[in-house]
C-alpha cells in the first residue's frame, strides 16, 4: 500500500512538480501561455508552427536516442488518487509532455492501471462518484489554477533538442520532414464527444513501434502496455502522432506531410472549439437561474425525505454529522469542478454550494437524515472501495519498480539535471498529499451510493442535457437574430430610400403651393379693407365677394348692428360660460325647444292644477318634462317612449314650481338664440343686397379680348408654316387653315366649336313647324340664337323690346307689355334679318368661289336665304311669347361664359350671354309681384340655397339701346368669323347633373340647320326626345314635374347655385296663346324639396365644431366615430356618380350654418386613397357639384391624392359636353395651380390633356397661365407629348405660345422634332422645323396675303 502510494506520488510529482515543489513562487513558466479558458499553450509549439509556416522544415533525423513511450492520459482520471491532476488530451495543457518526462517504468505501470477498469466498467461507476461525474464530463477540463506546469528540465531538454536539430539539418540530406509537438494531441478532443481523443489509440501503437525501431528494450511489463492500444484505439482514429515525436525529449525521426496536415486540422478544430466555448459563455446567466431552480427542487425533495424518515434516524444523524459534512463539502467541490471543466460554463456554483452548506442549517439536516438512512450501505461501499483500491495498488506495484529502473537509465539529461534531484523532495510532499486524496476518495465512494447523491447526479445530467438543448436553442436564436437584424437593416434602407423619394416628390408637388396661398391671402386682405368705400376692388377680386358682403351688411343695418355688437361679444362668452356650468344638464336642445313653444309653456304653468285631468295638458307638459330628462341625460338621443312614462307621474304630482323654473330658464335662453339667428339673417340679407351690384360682365369681356390677342399670334405662326411647306404641305390643311385664321383673328379660338356644330345642324334639317310642336326646349335653344339682341348691353334686339322704357317694370300695367313687345320685335327683327341675309350671302359666295364642290351643294343662295328668313320670323315670334312669360334661365344656361344673374335695384334680372365669341350683359325687365320682393328681402338668399348666385358684389344699371345700337353692337368686329358663320342655338335646356347628352344647333352659312352633339350623342337625335329627359329636375321625378309644370313654375338650376325661373312649365301648345305672366308665379317659386341633415349628422357636426381646434380631442375614440359618420354620409351624398346637386347644396348650407370651420373640414375630408369630394365630382363629370364646391370657397384645389393627382389634373382628362361645364372647369383652373406636378412621374395637367388629345382643356389651361416648357421626370414637355401622339392642332396651339421652346431635350437627348420624325408624323415635323428655323424671319402682316382664299380651308376643315 505504501509503495503504491509512492508510485502515485510519482505521477503527482510529475504533474504537479511546480505547484508542490520549491518552484511554487513562479506563477507562469516561460514556455507556457495560459488561455482564457484554462488551457495552456506551449511556446515551443507556437514557434514550431511558425517555423512550419515560414518553410523552415526539418529533415528526417537519425538520432540514437531512445524514446519514452506515451501513455493515454484520460484513463488516469479513473483512479481516485489522480483527481487533482488533469491529464486529459482535450485540454491545451502540457500533460502529455509531462507524461513523456516520466520514467518508463512508471509509464508502463500507469498503462496497467489504466487498462484495468476497462474490462469491467461497472466497478468504477459504483465505487467512485467522481468517476461517474468524470465519465459524463470528460469534455470539461478542470480550472486553470490546477493545471500542471513544466519545470526547468523542459527548458534544457528543448535547448538540447534544438542544438541537435540544427546539427542534423546541416549533415542530413534526406527529404525534409515535419516537426511534431505533443501539444497537438490536446486538440483532438476539442470537438469530440467521446471520452478519448480521436488519435489516442494510434498513439499507443506508434509509441511501441518507435521503441522497437529505435532499439528500445523494455522490461517484462512492456507486453502489458501494448494491449492497451487496441482497447483505446476503438474509440479514436488510426492516426496518432505520439509525444515521442514531439521533440521535447528527443528529435523526430520520421515526420511526413500527412502529420503536418493533421496538425492543421487539429488547430482548426481547436479554434472552432474555442469559438463554441465563447458562445456557451453567453448562456451562463440562464443556466444560473436554472441551477437555482433545480436547487430549490432538490431542497424540497430532501425536505420530503426528511419528514418521512425523521422519526427513526435522529441518533445516527448525530454520529455522522461531522464526517458527512466534510465529505459533502469535498464532493460538492468535485462536482463543481466537473461541471465547469469546460471553462466557459464556469459559474459561482461552487461558492454558492459551499455557502449554502455552511450557512443553511436546513440543508445540513437534510444531508444528515440521508446519511443516517444509508449507514449500512456506506459500510458496504467502503468495503468495496477498499477492495478496488487494493486491486489497483497490487496492479501498480510491479510497474513501479520498472518505472524507476527505466527512468534511471533511459534519459541521461533528466537524471543529471533535474529529475533525479527533485525526485526526493516532491515524492515526500506528494505522498502526504496522496494520503489526503485517498481519504477524500473513500468519503466520496461512500456518498456515491446514497439515494440523494444518485438523484443529484440525475439532476446534474438533466442540467447538462438542458444546457446542451439551451445551447442549441441559443444558437438557433442567434442565427434568427442575425437574419432578423439583416432584414431590419434592409427594411430600414428601403424605407430611407422611399422616404427620400417621397420627400423629393413632395418637394416637387409643393413648390408651387406657397405661391398660391400667398396670392389668396393678398386678395382677401385688401378686399376687406376697401369694401365699404369702393366697388371697383370688388370687381377685380371675385373670391372675396362673400366676405365683403358681410361687412356691407353691417353698414346697411346700423341699428341692428349696434344692438348685435353690444350684445354678441359679451353674450357669446356668457353663453359659453353658462354652457360649461350646465353642460351636463343641457346642451342646447332645450333652448331650441323653448324657442319653439315659449308661450305654450307659460300658459301651462298658469294652469298647472288642471294637468292631471286633461290629456292635452299632458301633451303640453311633455315639453317641460323633456327638458328635465334631456338635462339629466346630456347629449344622448333618449327615446320618446322613456320620456312618455314620466309625464304621468309628474302631472299627478303637479310640479308647477319646476315648470315655472324651466320656463324662466328657457326665457333666459331665448334672447341668446334669437340674437344668433338674427345676426345670421342679417348677413344673408346683406349678401343678397350685394348680389344686386354685380358688374362681372365687364371683367369677362376683358378676358375674351385678351384671348383674341393670343390667337392672333397663333395665326401669324401658322402663316409662316404655309410659306415654308413643300408641295405636299400645301395640299394639307395647315397651310389653308392658317390663312383662314389670319382673316378672323378675333374668333379663331372659338371657331373650333362652331364649325362642326354648323355642319351637323345642316344635316338634321329641323323645320320651323316641328319646333313649335315640340317642347319649349327647342324654342328656348333658339331664343339663345336670337336672344342677344334683347340684351340691353347691345346684342339682341328682341330682348330689348321686352324692357322698353327707363321706368321700372313694376309701374307698368299688366296688359301693356304684350302689344309693346309685339311692335318692338317687328322693328328689331326686320333690321336684324336683313343684316344676317347679307352676311350669309357673302359667305356662301366666298365659299363657292374657292371650292367648286361646295358650289353645287349651296345651289342658289337667295332661295335658301328666303327659307332662312321664314325660319327666323317663326322662331322669333315664338320666342317673343316665351320671353314675356318666362325668365332667362335657359339663356343663362346656354351661355359660353359663367352666368351672373341677380336682382338689381329696379327689380330687373341681370344676365350675361356670349354669342359668337362676343360677350354681352343686360337687364331683362320682369314684373315680379310685391309678395316675392318682400319674401326675398326678409328671408334672403340663404333660405333658398339653390338660388344663390355664384358671383356677387357688382351691379350694372339698366340701359335701353335702340335698334341701330343693337345692330352695330352685334357686329362690332367686321372680321368676326363666328359672327359671320353662325348664330348659336341650343337644342336642350338641361339644368341638372345627370350627364345627359347635350346637342347644339347652329344656323349655318348655307341657310340650313346643322346639328352637333357630344361624343355620346347621335347625330340624328331630335330636340323633342332630348327635352323629355332633360326636363326632369333634380328634386322631382318626371311624373310629379309634369303636374307641377301645369300648375306653376318651379325653380331650376339648383345644382349651379343660380337664381332660376321656370321656363319649361309651359307646354309648346300654350306658347303662342300665353303671354301674360301670372301673378301667383313668384309666390309658388319657392316650392322645392329640401334636404336636411339627420339628427346623428347634426350632433356630429356640433361635436366637431367644439373640438375642431383641439388636435388631441380629434384623436379621441368618440371623435373618430364622429368623423367616420361625417365622412361616410358626406361621401355618400357628394361623391357618387348619381349624386344630386340639390342635396349637396343643402348639405353645404347646413354645414355652413353650423360653422365655417366645420364646412371647410368636411369638404376637404379625404378617404383612404386621398381623394376628396372634389376629386370624385371631377372624375364623374358632375360639374354642377364642382361648381357648388368651388362656390363654397373653402376647397383645397391643390390637394393631391395618393397617386399624386390634383382635381385640376383629373379635370384635364374629364369629358366636357356643355359649355357651362367648360366654364366650371375654367373656374377650377383659375382657383388652383395649373403647373403643379404629379408625384409619380412629374407630369402636369397640360401634359395629361395633350397626351389624351383634349384640345379644349389645353386651351383652358393655357388661358389660365399653364407653362408650356415644364418638363417631367423624364424631361418630356407638352410639345413632345403632342408630337409623339400626332395631335397637329395641339402642336399648333402650343407653338403659338410666346415662350414655347422647341429646342428642349429630354433625358434621352431627343427633341420634339426628333420625336415627331420617329413617330412618323411628317406634318408635325414640318411645323416644328419651320418654328425652329423661320419663326423670327416672317413678318406679322404675312397672313393677310392670302385673304381671298382664306374662307375655303376653314370651312372645309369644319365639314371634314
Curated annotation (Swiss-Prot):
Molecular function (GO) terms for this protein are: beta-catenin binding; protein-macromolecule adaptor activity
- Consequence when changing residue 1306 to K: Impairs KIF21A binding
Q: Where in the cell is it found?
A: Cytoplasm, Cell cortex; Cell projection, Ruffle membrane; Cytoplasm; Nucleus
Membrane topology of this protein: Peripheral membrane protein
> Which residue ranges does the UniProt annotation give for the motif Nuclear export signal 3 (NES 3)?
618-627
Cite the residue spans of the region called Interaction with KIF21A: 1081-1360
Q: Where is this region: Disordered?
A: 66-103, 221-253, 929-954, 983-1053, 1337-1360
**Highest taxon above the source species:** Eukaryota
UniProt cross-references to SMART domains, sorted A to Z: ANK (SM00248)
List this protein's GO terms for biological process.
actin cytoskeleton organization; cell population proliferation; cortical microtubule organization; negative regulation of actin filament polymerization; negative regulation of cell migration; negative regulation of insulin receptor signaling pathway; negative regulation of lamellipodium morphogenesis; negative regulation of neuron projection development
Motif span (Nuclear localization signal 2 (NLS 2))?
Answer: 985-998
Positions of region (KN motif): 30-68
What are the Basic and acidic residues biased-composition ranges? 938-947, 985-995
Stretches the record annotates as Interaction with PPFIBP1:
244-339
Q: What is the effect of changing residue 1276 to F?
A: Impairs KIF21A binding
Classification via InterPro entries: Ankyrin_rpt, Ankyrin_rpt-contain_sf, KANK1-4, KN_motif
Q: Where is the composition biased (Acidic residues)?
A: 1026-1047
**Position of sequence motif Nuclear localization signal 1 (NLS 1):** 65-68
Give the protein's function. Answer: Adapter protein that links structural and signaling protein complexes positioned to guide microtubule and actin cytoskeleton dynamics during cell morphogenesis. At focal adhesions (FAs) rims, organizes cortical microtubule stabilizing complexes (CMSCs) and directly interacts with major FA component TLN1, forming macromolecular assemblies positioned to control microtubule-actin crosstalk at the cell edge. Recruits KIF21A in CMSCs at axonal growth cones and regulates axon guidance by suppressing microtubule growth without inducing microtubule disassembly once it reaches the cell cortex.
Name under which the protein is recorded: KN motif and ankyrin repeat domains 1
Lineage, top ranks: Eukaryota, Metazoa, Chordata, Craniata, Vertebrata
